[in-house]
Design a protein with these regions (language model features):
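Secreted/periplasmic carbohydrate-active enzymes, especially glycoside hydrolases
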Residues: 1-193
Length: 193
């Protein structure tokens, strides 16, 4: 069995992520300008917005970064835009966030980033992206995660046929078991094939 999700959206909406047959890229959240000791970074949220109305629409773009328990860390705005009928456009908002907990090996700290479109102050579309923020560096034969050198040891795992008779329908508990076996053996990296 596979999980199925039905997405219902206003005709002014943020597109679904990276579907080549739909020509969409969705929402992309990333961080840069890290200050690891100071626990801050600049967070950017970009969203591809599509207007399927027959007339232009003016909207504001707002971002909320929250803990997974709902506690809001920061809200910031990307301004107001007018999008023509049938147009698809990318909008963006950035802010420097402080008191961040960075995602790290053995400490998978996550945030819920909500990107919202508002027309006349009324929300018409919102997308929640669960993500973590971390600084990666590759150079001189060294890998660093949040400024700390990390020796990588891992596995090459195929996305299918790893468990006989299951195929692509891997339930979450079986994925958790695979991950636990890798960690118990000292692995900290999975290369998907």
């Amino acid at each position: 069995n596979k999980n199925v999700r039905l997405h219902l959206a206003d005709r002014l909406h943020q597109t679904l992520p990276l579907y080549s047959n739909l020509g969409t890229v969705g929402v992309y959240v990333y961080a840069k300008d890290f200050d690891i000791p100071g626990r801050s970074a600049t967070v950017t949220a970009e969203a591809q917005v599509r207007n399927e109305y027959a007339e232009p629409k003016t909207f504001s773009y707002e971002v909320t970064v929250a803990e997974t328990d709902g506690k809001v860390l920061q809200r910031f705005k990307g301004g107001t835009a007018t999008i023509a009928a049938g147009e698809t456009r990318t909008v963006s908002a950035s802010a420097t966030l402080s008191n961040l907990n960075f995602w790290s090996w053995g400490y998978g700290y996550l945030y819920d980033v909500t990107t919202a479109l508002k027309v006349d102050g009324r929300p018409v579309d919102a997308v929640v992206t669960r993500t973590g923020f971390r600084k990666l560096e590759f150079g001189h034969g060294i890998f660093k995660l949040n400024g700390r050198t990390l020796h990588l040891r891992g596995y090459a795992q195929r996305s299918t046929d790893e468990w006989p008779a299951v195929g692509q329908c891997v339930p979450p508990w079986l994925s958790d078991l695979s991950n636990a076996l890798q960690i118990e053996s000292g692995g900290n990296l999975v290369r998907w094939m």
